[in-house]
């Protein structure tokens, strides 16, 4: 299944979650497109709820179905709770960490920064958004990319970096200190529904 490339605003409203991370999509019309008000949502079946939760998380990270399922399967082979492991693996992706550090205003921008070679890990350029970070690894912006407006503006307005990361805004240098805890990740996602979806 190909990565979704349609309107993120419509998709955000349909799923009831801000895919951009800004929340602007839901400010004026916090209901699905094509509906006439917030009370028009159809009651979903158990399968429908599971599917919607899976789509919410997949679109949030901008992944193809194959990438998403592969990561889910890897999480299932790890010790611990499958759903929590899955969420932690997703949050440990390079593009997710670039976004969480505040180097990009949206996850899509973060993915583009990585794709276009603007990001380095431990001093070497990495252009794979799905690159899985390990504790202690250092994320920096390439020297020739440090004056990009998209990066400077993002860092300027960002006022929060999660505790599992460390960020030196002056040098555009971040450290993946440790794996995040579930409580530090999106609370609006019920990953157990995703586990149930793939366990059908």
From Swiss-Prot:
Keyword list, A-Z: Ribonucleoprotein, Ribosomal protein, RNA-binding, rRNA-binding
Gene Ontology cellular component annotations, sorted alphabetically: small ribosomal subunit
Keyword Protein transport: no
GO function term, MF aspect, one: rRNA binding
Residue span(s) of domain S4 RNA-binding: 92-155
Keyword Ribonucleoprotein (UniProt): yes
A biological process from GO: translation
Pfam family, one: Ribosomal_S4
Signal peptide residues on this chain, from the entry's feature table: none
Subunit structure: Part of the 30S ribosomal subunit. Contacts protein S5. The interaction surface between S4 and S5 is involved in control of translational fidelity.
Function summary: One of the primary rRNA binding proteins, it binds directly to 16S rRNA where it nucleates assembly of the body of the 30S subunit. With S5 and S12 plays an important role in translational accuracy.
PANTHER family: 30S 40S RIBOSOMAL PROTEIN (PTHR11831), SMALL RIBOSOMAL SUBUNIT PROTEIN US4M (PTHR11831:SF4)
Similarity comment: family membership: Belongs to the universal ribosomal protein uS4 family.
Name of the protein in its database record: Small ribosomal subunit protein uS4
Gene from which this protein is expressed: rpsD
């Amino acid at each position: 299944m190909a990565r979704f490339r349609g309107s993120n605003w419509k998709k955000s409203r349909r799923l009831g979650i801000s895919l951009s991370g800004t929340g602007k999509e839901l400010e004026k019309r916090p209901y699905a497109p094509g509906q006439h008000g917030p009370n028009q949502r159809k009651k979903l079946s158990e399968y429908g709820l599971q599917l919607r939760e899976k789509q919410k998380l997949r679109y949030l990270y901008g992944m193809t179905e194959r990438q998403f399922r592969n990561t889910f399967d890897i999480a299932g082979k790890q010790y611990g709770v499958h759903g929590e492991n899955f969420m932690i693996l997703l949050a440990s992706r390079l593009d997710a960490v670039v976004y969480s550090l505040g180097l990009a205003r949206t996850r899509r921008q973060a993915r583009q920064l990585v794709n276009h070679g603007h990001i380095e890990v431990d001093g070497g350029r990495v252009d794979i958004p799905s690159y899985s970070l390990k504790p202690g690894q250092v994320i920096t912006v390439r020297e020739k990319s440090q004056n990009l407006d998209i990066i400077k503006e993002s860092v300027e307005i960002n006022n929060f970096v999660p505790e599992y990361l460390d960020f030196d805004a002056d040098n555009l240098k971040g450290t993946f200190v440790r794996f995040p805890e579930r409580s530090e990740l999106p609370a609006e996602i019920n990953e157990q529904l995703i586990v149930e979806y793939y366990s059908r």
